[in-house]
């Protein structure tokens, strides 16, 4: 299941389209909450007189890890909530739908879904167990002790699939300098 934030680089959407054709053992399903970029713009520019105008920024849109200045001038990074709200929740919602569970109903006791998450060894700090009793997580790349470079080398060795780029929202401040340069150029 691919969770689309609505603000991914073009190459991510191209690779998803490739995978939809290349994967034959199961469908590649796309889910989305909404467009994170549009949500950020709307939150920063509420319509005068609307209910949105009186809500806190955090109450209207999940916080991406952006830098912000406090009234006193001190600068800090906002708490990161965007991955959970724009990826984890929509994926879990789709899993419940695929299980036939209606909103606000419990997943049947004894049901177990195993999700595989593509986190490499250089991102091991991002591993988090699912907080739902019916959902277990596996990290195959971690189990195979594969770093991002190992994954790229595997792609080079098999010469079967196009090389995927690093997936992350365009506006995410966690990009490496080469990613920023590539986005600026392309």
Regions found by a protein language model. Give the residues of each.
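Nucleotide-activated chemistry modules centered on ATP-dependent adenylation/adenylyltransferase
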Residues: 1-186
